[in-house]
C-alpha cells in the first residue's frame, strides 16, 4: 500500500502543480518538473473570489469558461473538494443550470469506478461533469489528509492519460534472478536461528509521468 500511495501522490501532484518532488534516504532530493504553463495554476484574486459574490445574482459560468480556455485541450470534467462544491452550489444561477437528470456516461463511469465511497458525481454543468472528490492519504505523522487541498478546483478531460514509469531496482538478488521489467519486485528471505524468521519485502522505483501538464487547469477558489 505504501508504494501505491507514492504512485498516487506523484500522479496527484503532477496534475495539481505540473511537478513533484522525489525524496528518499538513499538518493538526493529531485524535483520532477513537466513544464506546466504559469497560467494553468490560478488563484482567485480580491474582487474575483467566489466567496465575495452575491448568491442570488452571480453567474460563475464566465469564470469557468475563462479557466477552461487555459487548457491545451477540451475540458469535460471539473473535480473539486467539498468547499468549492458548497460555494458553487450556493449560487442560484449555478443550481438552475446544473443538470442532475442526464443519462449515464460510460467514460465517466469508468473514470470514477471503484471510488464510490470517496467520489460523488453531482451532475452536468453544460458539457462539464461535476465531481466532488474526498480521496485521502496517510501522512508521515500517521494522520489522514486529503489529496485535494481545501478550495481546489481541477479542470481536465477524462481521456487525459499519464504514463507509469519504473526505474531499475538496485538489488543484486534481483539481478541474479534475471529480473525482467516489472512495476514491483517482491522478495523474501530466511534468517537462521531459534526461532528462524522469514521476511518479505516489495521494492519499486515509480515515476509517474504527465506528458501534457497543460491538459489540466487548477484553480484555488476563495
Task: Name these PLM-found stretches.
Residues 24-26, 70-72, 191-192, 210-211:
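A generic structural signal for short, solvent-exposed coil/turn residues
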Residues 27-109:
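Extended, solvent-exposed, turn-rich assembly/linker loops in the middle of proteins
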Residues 95-96, 100-222:
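Sequence/fold signature of self-assembling virion shell proteins
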Amino acid at each position: 500500500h505504501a508504494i501505491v500511495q507514492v504512485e498516487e501522490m506523484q500522479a496527484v501532484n503532477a496534475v495539481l502543480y505540473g511537478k513533484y518532488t522525489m525524496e528518499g534516504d538513499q538518493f538526493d532530493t529531485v524535483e520532477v518538473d513537466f513544464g506546466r504553463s504559469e497560467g494553468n495554476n490560478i488563484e482567485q484574486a480580491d474582487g474575483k473570489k467566489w466567496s465575495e459574490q452575491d448568491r442570488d445574482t452571480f453567474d460563475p459560468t464566465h469564470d469557468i469558461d475563462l479557466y477552461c480556455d487555459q487548457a491545451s485541450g477540451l475540458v469535460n470534467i471539473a473535480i473539486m473538494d467539498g468547499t468549492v462544491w458548497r460555494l458553487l452550489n450556493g449560487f442560484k444561477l449555478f443550481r438552475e443550470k446544473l443538470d442532475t437528470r442526464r443519462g449515464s456516461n460510460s467514460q465517466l463511469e469508468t473514470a470514477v469506478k471503484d471510488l464510490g465511497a470517496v467520489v460523488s458525481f453531482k451532475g452536468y454543468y453544460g458539457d462539464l461533469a461535476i465531481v466532488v472528490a474526498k480521496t485521502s492519504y496517510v501522512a508521515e505523522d500517521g494522520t489522514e489528509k486529503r489529496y485535494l487541498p481545501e478550495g481546489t478546483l481541477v479542470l481536465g478531460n477524462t481521456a487525459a492519460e499519464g504514463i507509469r514509469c519504473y526505474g531499475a531496482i538496485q538489488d543484486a538478488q534481483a539481478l541474479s534472478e534475471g529480473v525482467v521489467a516489472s512495476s514491483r519486485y517482491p522478495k523474501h528471505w530466511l534468517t537462521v536461528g531459534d526461532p528462524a524468521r522469514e521476511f518479505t519485502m516489495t521494492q519499486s522505483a515509480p515515476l509517474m509521468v504527465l506528458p501534457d501538464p497543460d491538459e489540466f487547469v487548477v484553480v484555488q477558489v476563495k
